[in-house]
From Swiss-Prot:
Protein name: UPF0260 protein VIBHAR_03078
Alphabetized Pfam families for the sequence: CxxCxxCC
Record-linked PANTHER family: UPF0260 PROTEIN YCGN (PTHR37421:SF1)
Family: Belongs to the UPF0260 family.
Naturally occurring in which organism (per UniProt): Vibrio campbellii (strain ATCC BAA-1116)
Domain of life: Bacteria
InterPro entries given in the database record: Puta_zinc/iron-chelating_dom, UCP006173
Length: 150
């Protein structure tokens, strides 16, 4: 059996198809983040982009996400050094930090079911930006399993 591509290739050398398949579809990228102006610390909220389908954890207009979702961030190979803002469970970040993919990752399990069962997606855990008055009320504390591994 051959070595999985994510273990044998650097992020820079992956094909577009391989790159896209790294995304586990958790939906955490689609949550709004707030930055502390004094410390530059990033805080995750449970406030989702209006384009996120909270049941499937995917964009309602994925092919056009960079034009229809003006705040949607495109992850590129050129930005690898800046991936520290990504969730600590994100494959792009993990591989950039030379860490293994989590055991529930769809590339390992073959489906998103294990990710949802492990509670690693935003499925049914979000509110939409249109319904939010005070965004700071929606800051989420990261559980220990999502904190940086040192």
């Amino acid at each position: 059996m051959s070595t999985p591509f994510w273990q044998s290739k650097s992020l820079e050398h992956m094909t577009e198809e391989e790159w896209e398949s790294l995304c586990d579809g958790c939906g955490k990228c689609c949550l709004h983040k707030l930055m502390d102006e004094d410390t530059d610390e990033i805080y995750y909220t449970n406030v989702a982009c209006s384009w996120l389908n909270s049941k499937t954890c995917s964009c309602k207009d994925y092919p056009n996400r960079f034009t229809s979702g003006e705040e949607c961030t495109k992850l590129t190979r050129e930005d690898i050094d800046d991936f520290t803002w990504l969730p600590h469970t994100c494959a792009y970040r993990l591989l950039a930090e030379n860490q293994p993919l989590p055991e529930w990752h769809p590339l390992i399990t073959g489906s998103k079911s294990a990710m949802h069962a492990a509670g690693e997606s935003v499925r049914n855990k979000v509110v939409y930006e249109i319904d939010v008055v005070d965004w700071e009320d929606h800051i989420q504390n990261l559980p220990d399993r999502l904190k940086p591994h040192n």
